[in-house]
Design a protein with these regions (language model features):
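Intrinsically disordered, low-complexity terminal regions enriched in Ser/Thr/Pro/Gly
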Residues: 20-242
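Sec-dependent N-terminal signal peptides
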Residues: 3-15
Length: 242
């Protein structure tokens, strides 16, 4: 006999996230430093006592300084993720890497449709941290930093959910499905669909009903959708579209 369970997922629309860097409409400001967006989501780790945290950093081409070399335009920038203790008394660890970009035309470098998404994951001990993300343009040496608290929870085997990740596109090919995260969390009045990715962890095969609730904080309206899921033992990947 299958066990029927009720899971609850809540999504706020219209609010700014702690981990989100907001854009300025001042074009001079945009060119002064590499403005970026960052998002993070927690998942069950394969390592005992750890939680895997995925980080996505999105940098628009228009916010990085490109240099023409030959027939192409090149740019690069450094990303630094610094993990502090909750009280910022010490650095737990730091990760630094370089991203390289290329464009075929000057128009590409200034297009607001072009951006680069960096992806890194770390297996971390559950707890409260403070995270500082710094993006530095390699050519101009100008940088932008963003700090925010990071609360990493323990994810259990019996029945649990990962964090929600807002996605802009789901790509299907011969290798399966892949997602494009909506790192900037851009939702406009032209958005007709809203998709989220999450993982459900179960220690047995069972039927679960997921209650998705989306709240528009501007008008106070709630949108509810009940989604039945035939869970298999282990990791169950779910893409839900409102």
């Amino acid at each position: 006999m299958k066990t029927i369970l009720l899971l609850f997922v809540f999504l706020l629309i219209g609010s700014s996230l702690n981990a989100q860097v907001e854009y300025s409409s001042n074009s001079q400001f945009l060119k002064s430093a590499p403005i970026f967006s960052i998002d993070a989501a927690s998942y069950k780790s394969s390592k005992e006592g750890k939680t895997r945290v995925d980080f996505f950093i999105q940098v628009p081409y228009a916010n990085i300084q490109f240099v023409k070399k030959g027939n192409e335009f090149l740019a690069s920038y450094n990303i630094t993720l610094t993990f502090y203790a909750e009280d910022k008394s010490r650095i737990i660890f730091e990760s630094i890497w370089k991203e390289k970009l290329s464009a075929e035309s000057f128009e590409e470098t200034n297009s607001t449709d072009n951006f680069n998404i960096s992806y890194k994951f770390f297996d971390l001990t559950p707890g409260k941290y403070n995270l500082k993300c710094t993006v530095e343009d390699s050519d101009s040496r100008k940088s932008t930093s963003r700090e925010f608290p990071l609360n990493i929870r323990e994810i259990v085997d019996s029945l649990d959910l990962s964090d929600l990740l807002l996605v802009t596109d789901v790509i299907k090919d011969s290798l399966g499905e892949s997602i494009v995260p909506n790192v900037a969390r851009m939702v406009t009045n032209k958005t007709t669909e809203l998709s989220v990715y999450l993982e459900i962890y179960s220690n047995k095969n069972q039927l679960a009903y997921i209650d998705f609730t989306m709240k528009d904080i501007k008008n106070g309206k709630n949108f509810n959708q009940l989604s039945p899921q035939e869970l298999k033992k282990g990791i169950n990947k779910v893409i839900h579209t409102f």
